[in-house]
């Protein structure tokens, strides 16, 4: 007897199926396909198992498919059993039935081009009632009747509904669906319904009934724009009392509490109002209240404001001049304000022009002026106007003083002596004529260019070209919010921590993008130092469309936290800066960190394994990475700091191959793929979390130790994803069952033992970071230094057409890899030796052995050679 088993598609979460076991009948059925067992209808209880069987006769190794409601059953266990050579039985097992499993089932098999179908069976799943309509939350006025609805279905039927008001039964029994009529409530009340059938009962969600009330008083009332007759007002509405606000009233008075106040009613939203026809230069006060269906709110506080005044409305009268031996005395009548809003007068403004082009403007206190700086041999034209703090009034009629007159006369300049206006008129005419000629010339050019193309269209009397109005743009530079910590809306405590590390935006220049994610990005930048030199840094910033103050505060708290750290294996803060933005938008906060040339540790490990030019990382290097991280975490734990997000992606690799613990919060925004949202909570890196963190949201230094164990596993696997093939939602059940990450290939037993200790279910049984550091340093000390002859970083390529000694791929002479053509700063590089067409592969174009370095003592070690010597322990390496 042969047995063939097939399950649902891997990777899909299996449904909980249910059913009633049917009997296997003796295999004496007629040739063909049939459903075994007698029932055409099956009824099972929710949660019970069921097995459906069908028989196939006269076929060798048939491919039996089970169908439900016309679709292939994929998420259930299916077994094919061979009774004899051409007699097979197909078995469908449903372990625990749910309502969704009810339906019409049959099996089918292909016989050449023909599909044979068995008889079908209808599966009914019975259980406690299922709610299709539950009572909803409501906000109602006091003592106003309302209704609540409830509906539940079987099978089995019938379903009976009972209503509850808090702990008291208030209605039922009634058939489903049911409506409860409530005469009204006077306080917050909860209602729920119960559904009963012969299988049991189910209770609906509670419906919370809240009382509506008049709204609260508005606040933040602000007069935003003021002119001489208008004022714009804006405010923030108070709590709406669970009812829609329909209008607000703005009350305006000359003094707070004045009886004769102007009231303006405006529909809302928006919560703004334009007050018109106000008196100029007048003190006012205003207040606002809003209303909903239950009534108005109290008024907000009185807000005083003053309208602007008016410029003088009249020109000075009786403007005349008297010649004297010492000069020219000018006199005019005082301007009396016609409107109280004009305010106090300032000095008068006197303007004069002579025929020779000389002109000037004087400010005169009083109504008399003595003009001495003028040429009596030339005609003189004068004007005067009144002014105040608001502006200038209208000019008087021109006063012409002729070179032949002994006194000036007010009126139009004389034609014989006033040639200046004539010149101005001629110039105006010339400019106008030139403009018209230019317009005609451009029009003619367009007609010449497009005339032939549009002749047929114009002949029909149709418009040749249709234009649409373009957008208009404001060429003025938009207003910018000053980039200060006060403009971000963060707490005073956080501002105090960041004030001494705030760096002006002008002090650095942003460069290329290093990485970005759902909420933020990292960019390279050049920071100008006090001595004028520049240093390369990394700048983390939120996205431009992130404007919530909570996101900004969380982002900057990471910087405030890093400010306190001082350890070679913990990322240290360089500073914080703010990037100004136009259109009144909040500045973008930026956290400035040291630039780590090799990026994050996870990306480096991944490149060593599956990059364009993979390279080997010796075991000493991998253990050294672990020692560095343990040193950094030992320092953090000694300062009572809990990281909560330790992973290879959150460790940075410096130029000298030392590892720094970093990313105290922002990393989950950059690497959002490793995070999972549980319910309404924030996204969590569940595959790095300890059991107590997953179960109780509890984070301690012991949970950081668990994450360190997962990070060690990442390092030993060169960046593989932990728990591959297991969904985030299934991690807790996987771990609570006693499962842990498997020992990676080529991982030392001592290293894996340390990992496994980190994953103890009892947090107190996990080792401390001090213990981990000491054990790892002990392991590192016992590892032998790899000789360069055994170092798999090097692959010698023979001449073109000849196989390499180690069986590696061949490259012809002169051929370059893509990395050689670059600047040599990538993960892999190739250095050519023209004499024997021999290539050396390494993480960065390294020399083949230290001996080759000695042959060229005058050449300094390049970056890649230094990396190899660091990995082999031939250069000093920073330690704890």
From Swiss-Prot:
Residues recorded with modification Phosphoserine: 456, 808, 859
EC number(s) on file: 2.7.10.1
Family per record: Belongs to the protein kinase superfamily. Tyr protein kinase family. AXL/UFO subfamily.
Keyword Acyltransferase in record: no
Residues carrying Phosphotyrosine: 671, 675-676, 794
Expressing tissues: Abundant in the brain and lower levels in other tissues.
Cell location: Cell membrane
GO biological process, one term: neuron cellular homeostasis
Name under which the protein is recorded: Tyrosine-protein kinase receptor TYRO3
Ranges for domain Protein kinase: 508-785
Domain Ig-like C2-type, chain residue ranges per copy: 31-118, 129-210
Occurrences of domain Fibronectin type-III (ranges): 217-310, 315-406
Keyword tRNA processing found: no
Domain of life: Eukaryota
PANTHER family in the record: TYROSINE-PROTEIN KINASE RECEPTOR (PTHR24416), TYROSINE-PROTEIN KINASE RECEPTOR TYRO3 (PTHR24416:SF279)
Membrane-spanning residues: 420-440
Disulphide-bonded residues: 54-107, 150-193
Annotated region described as Disordered, given as residue ranges: 804-827, 842-864
Gene3D superfamilies the UniProt entry points to: Immunoglobulins, Phosphorylase Kinase, domain 1, Transferase(Phosphotransferase) domain 1
Gene that this polypeptide is encoded by: Tyro3
Organism of this sequence: Rattus norvegicus (Rat)
One of the record's GO molecular function terms: protein tyrosine kinase activity
